[in-house]
């Protein structure tokens, strides 16, 4: 059985971010999210529609 030498960068957590320049004019949406509501309204928080 032959031992395998581990690489030094196994736990390298450095992250490279390629951010594009932008302004704060709001021309493009920053967060794109959607709400999923069930039909009907209820007062409890058991995945009933809180979106009413």
Swiss-Prot record:
Indicate the cross-link positions, S-(2-aminovinyl)-D-cysteine (Ser-Cys). 49-52
One of the record's GO cellular component terms: extracellular region
Q: Which GO terms describe its molecular function?
A: signaling receptor binding
Where can the Beta-methyllanthionine (Thr-Cys) cross-link be found? 38-41
Keyword Electron transport belongs to the record: no
Q: Which Pfam families match?
A: Gallidermin
Q: How is it modified after translation?
A: Maturation of lantibiotics involves the enzymatic conversion of Thr, and Ser into dehydrated AA and the formation of thioether bonds with cysteine. The C-terminal lanthionine undergoes decarboxylation. This is followed by membrane translocation and cleavage of the modified precursor.
Q: Which domain of life is it from?
A: Bacteria
- What does the record list as GO biological process? defense response to bacterium; killing of cells of another organism
Question: Crosslink site(s) for Lanthionine (Ser-Cys)?
Answer: 33-37, 46-51
Pro-segment residues? 1-30
**Keywords assigned by UniProt?**
Antibiotic, Antimicrobial, Bacteriocin, D-amino acid, Lantibiotic, Plasmid, Thioether bond
InterPro entries in the record:
Lantibiotic_typ-A_Bacillales
Please list the residues that carry the modification (Z)-2,3-didehydrobutyrine: 44
Family the UniProt entry places it in: Belongs to the type A lantibiotic family.
Entry-linked NCBIfam families = lanthi_I_FDLD, lantibio_gallid
| Job description of the protein | Lanthionine-containing peptide antibiotic (lantibiotic) active on Gram-positive bacteria. The bactericidal activity of lantibiotics is based on depolarization of energized bacterial cytoplasmic membranes, initiated by the formation of aqueous transmembrane pores.
Full protein name: Lantibiotic epidermin
| Protein species of origin | Staphylococcus epidermidis
Show the taxonomic lineage: Bacteria, Bacillati, Bacillota, Bacilli, Bacillales
